[in-house]
């Protein structure tokens, strides 16, 4: 089995490296990692407008590039190498993946074009204890007519204080363990959401707290 990059994947990797060498100097990284937002908005705009990395995993019929995880890894390796502070991980690795795996056709049609246009996304999963297993989901939901009511607190949400779109993991009231878990997606401007920056040791990956 051949694990080497293809010529196209090598080109993607090398193009990413050249872009990041030019735009992610140590000085720039230190400047923006100390801010509450945690990244340079102008850099994110250049990533979206010039590189179109936000479209990497999005199928072509939604306006994306329709590439795969090997191409994603090629870019992530370079982002890690140059400590690129950006909402790419939360938006693409988490948000887009959640939509592709679990989203309805209507949700994909609504939210994928927004992410392609530069809006940011993330997943809120961990409860106050910070675990990533199913038992750590502390937010509950119940159905009220045609709507759902969610209550709970999420901690250590990547870009949770700044993302435009939230994918929320919640458990139905009364359910235990892996039972009754659903994902909800909504704009962060939805009423009833309180968000705040949660400073952590690794300032290159901003975390937030989300309260419903």
State where each predicted segment sits:
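N-terminal glycine-rich flavin-associated loop
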Residues: 86-106
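A short core secondary-structure module
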Residues: 151-196
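Cytochrome P450 C-terminal beta-domain/meander region
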Residues: 133-151
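Long, well-ordered alpha-helical segments
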Residues: 16-26, 103-107, 145-151, 182-193, ...
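Amphipathic, small/basic residue-rich leader segments at the start of a protein or domain
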Residues: 1-89, 110, 114
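Flexible, small-/acidic-enriched active-site or ligand-binding loops
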Residues: 136-139, 156-157, 187-212
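A short, Trp-centered hydrophobic/proline-enriched beta-strand micro-motif
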Residues: 117-127
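Structural signature of FAD isoalloxazine-binding scaffolds in flavoprotein oxidoreductases
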Residues: 66-75, 133-137, 186-187
């Amino acid at each position: 089995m051949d694990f080497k990059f293809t010529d196209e994947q090598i080109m993607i990797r090398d193009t990413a490296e050249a872009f990041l060498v030019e735009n992610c100097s140590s000085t720039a990284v230190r400047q923006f990692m100390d801010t509450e937002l945690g990244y340079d908005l102008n850099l994110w705009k250049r990533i979206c407008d010039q590189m179109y990395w936000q479209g990497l995993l999005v199928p072509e019929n939604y306006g994306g590039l329709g590439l795969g995880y090997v191409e994603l890894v090629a870019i992530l390796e370079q982002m890690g190498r140059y400590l690129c502070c950006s909402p790419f991980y939360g938006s693409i690795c988490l948000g887009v993946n959640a939509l592709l795996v679990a989203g309805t056709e209507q949700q994909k049609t609504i939210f994928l074009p927004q992410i392609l246009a530069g809006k940011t996304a993330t997943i809120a999963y961990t409860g106050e204890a910070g675990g990533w297993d199913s038992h750590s989901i502390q937010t509950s939901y119940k159905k009220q007519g045609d709507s759902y009511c969610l209550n709970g607190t999420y901690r250590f949400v990547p870009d949770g204080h700044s993302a435009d779109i939230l994918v929320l993991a919640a458990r139905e009231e009364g359910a235990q363990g892996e039972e009754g878990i659903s994902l909800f997606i909504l704009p962060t401007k939805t009423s009833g959401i309180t968000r705040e920056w949660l400073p952590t040791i690794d300032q290159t990956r901003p975390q937030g707290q989300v309260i419903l």
